[in-house]
Amino acid sequence: MDNYLGKDCIFYSMLAVPVPVYARQKMTREDIVRDALTGWLTVEFVFRPLKNDLISGMIYQGKIMYLLQQILPEEKGYRLLGFTAEQEEWCRNNEEQIWRFLIENDYLFSTQQRIMTKYLNDAPFTSGMPVESPGRAVVWTGYRIVGKYMQKKKNVSLERLMAEQDYHKILREAGYRP
């Protein structure tokens, strides 16, 4: 519970290793349910991709966010991602640029652990993008891909979605084009 004392809690800055400001934004009591459910879902639906690359990690995390949205339909999408409304708006306004950035830098199908860590883990902003971008902006893209996939595949149940480990198949069948 000490992770949810509020973003302005003075104790976070007094620790031997202070909690960065960007991380404190997600340390409110409103984040408890999201974090608890995310933890539970990642244990229930383990990441076992056919190919361990960035796009697979993006879509896996997008699937977790999509399922969270189904469980908590009243919660704003940006809150489920740990973003502010402004950060989600930035992603919406720059969706095509995010996608182009991943393709032009050959990151989308990268299997390099440092690339996956850099883009899938929490950060003050997404490396290589403006400081206005949220950390993990590519996870928002994964969430959008899953949304497009489920929109096209109306017969796919949540159970089937979560069981699918061929993330390249989800990408292909989503027909995602920002």
Region roles according to the model:
Residues 1-88:
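Acidic/His-rich structured neighborhood in mature extracellular/periplasmic domains
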Residues 55, 59-178:
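A cross-kingdom marker for long, charged
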